[in-house]
C-alpha cells in the first residue's frame, strides 16, 4: 500500500527542513547498495554533519519547489537517487562519500549543488581535495601567530638597534 497524502507532506516537510540547514547536496545513484552499505555511508557522513536521505524524486521536487538555491537539483532527479545533504564540513563529507564509493564500487555521484550552483564531477572532486575545516583553522592560527611574532621581533629590534648605534657612536667619540 502506498503512502498517504499526509505522510508524503510530512516527508516533504522534513526534506525542506534538511535543505534549509544544508550548504551542499550531492545526488548519488544508489542502485545495488545493500541496507548495510547504506548504513555505513550514513555513519560516515554523521562525522561531518552530513545526512543521506533516500526518497522519491517527486517528493524531492516538491521540497525544492520555490527554493531558488535548490532548483538546480531538478535536472538530477532521474532514476534511483540518494541525496547527501551537508551542513557542516563540506570537504570532509565529500571525501567520505568518495571513499565509500571507492570501497563499494557500486554507487556513483550524478552531480551536486553548492550555493545554488550545479557542480560537475571535476568540481566535486576538487572540493574533496580541500583541507578540512580544522586544518584551515590551524593554518590561519599559524599565520596569525607568525605575524605577531614578527611584529614583536620588529618592535624589539628598534630599541636594540638604537642602543647599538649609541654604543658605536660613543666608542667612536672616545677614539
UniProtKB/Swiss-Prot annotation:
Alphabetic keyword roster: Ribonucleoprotein, Ribosomal protein, RNA-binding, rRNA-binding
Superkingdom to which the source organism belongs: Bacteria
CC annotations in GO: large ribosomal subunit
CDD domains: Ribosomal_L10 (cd05797)
GO MF terms held by the record: large ribosomal subunit rRNA binding; structural constituent of ribosome
Matches recorded under Pfam families: Ribosomal_L10
Annotated family: Belongs to the universal ribosomal protein uL10 family.
NCBIfam families associated with the record: PRK00099.1-1 (NF000955)
Protein name: Large ribosomal subunit protein uL10
Species name: Prochlorococcus marinus (strain NATL2A)
Lineage summary: Bacteria, Bacillati, Cyanobacteriota, Cyanophyceae, Synechococcales
Amino acid at each position: 500500500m502506498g503512502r498517504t497524502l499526509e505522510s508524503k507532506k510530512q516527508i516533504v516537510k522534513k526534506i525542506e527542513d534538511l535543505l534549509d540547514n544544508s550548504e551542499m547536496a550531492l545526488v548519488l545513484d544508489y542502485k545495488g547498495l545493500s541496507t548495510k552499505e547504506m548504513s555505513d555511508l550514513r555513519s560516515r557522513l554523521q562525522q561531518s554533519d552530513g545526512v543521506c536521505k533516500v526518497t522519491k524524486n517527486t517528493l524531492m521536487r516538491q521540497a525544492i519547489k520555490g527554493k531558488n538555491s535548490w532548483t538546480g537539483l531538478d535536472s538530477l532527479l532521474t532514476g534511483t537517487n540518494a541525496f547527501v545533504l551537508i551542513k557542516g564540513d563540506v570537504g570532509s563529507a565529500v571525501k567520505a562519500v568518495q571513499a565509500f564509493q571507492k570501497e563499494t564500487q557500486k554507487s556513483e555521484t550524478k552531480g551536486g549543488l553548492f550555493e545554488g550552483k550545479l557542480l560537475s564531477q571535476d568540481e566535486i572532486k576538487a572540493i574533496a581535495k580541500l583541507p578540512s575545516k580544522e586544518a584551515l583553522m590551524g593554518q590561519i592560527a599559524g599565520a596569525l601567530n607568525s605575524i605577531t611574532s614578527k611584529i614583536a621581533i620588529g618592535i624589539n629590534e628598534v630599541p636594540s638597534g638604537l642602543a647599538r648605534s649609541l654604543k658605536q657612536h660613543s666608542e667612536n667619540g672616545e677614539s
